[in-house]
Amino acid sequence: MTSRQFEQFVATERGMLVRLAMNILHHPEDADDAVAEALCKAWERREQLRSPDKMRSWVAKITVNTALSMIQKRKREELVESMDDYPTNEASGYPHS
């Protein structure tokens, strides 16, 4: 796949990819970020695509996986932040065991 062919694909399919990411992430900026990341991954891995006629579904799958990874990362970050609210052993007054 040439860079010109990829650019044409992006021009044609970007809207569909953003809608797909929006259905998962429910936030326009996150959806745009997911699509940008997915398109970078697709370009870097373009040699792995065996059938050019499967390009649309292949990039859609990369987009879905990227969006889901973003959700998992966000949940991990929220968990770490919520753990900061719990007192440590020293702050709780309990002796160390």
Predicted regions and their residues:
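A short, charge-rich alpha-helical start-of-domain segment used by transcription regulators
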Residues: 1-19, 29, 35, 43
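A short, mixed-charge helix-start or loop-turn motif at secondary-structure junctions
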Residues: 1-4, 20, 24, 89-92
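Short, structured helix-loop boundary elements
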Residues: 3, 7, 28, 32, ...
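Acidic, proline/glycine-rich intrinsically disordered inter-domain spacer in sigma factors
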Residues: 8, 78, 85-97
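Conserved amphipathic alpha-helical interaction elements at protein-protein interfaces in regulatory
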Residues: 12, 23, 27, 44-48, ...
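Structural recognition of an alpha-helix C-terminal capping motif at a helix-to-coil junction
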Residues: 19, 33-40, 44, 53-65
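Arg/Lys-rich amphipathic alpha helix in sigma70-family domain 2
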Residues: 50, 61-81, 95
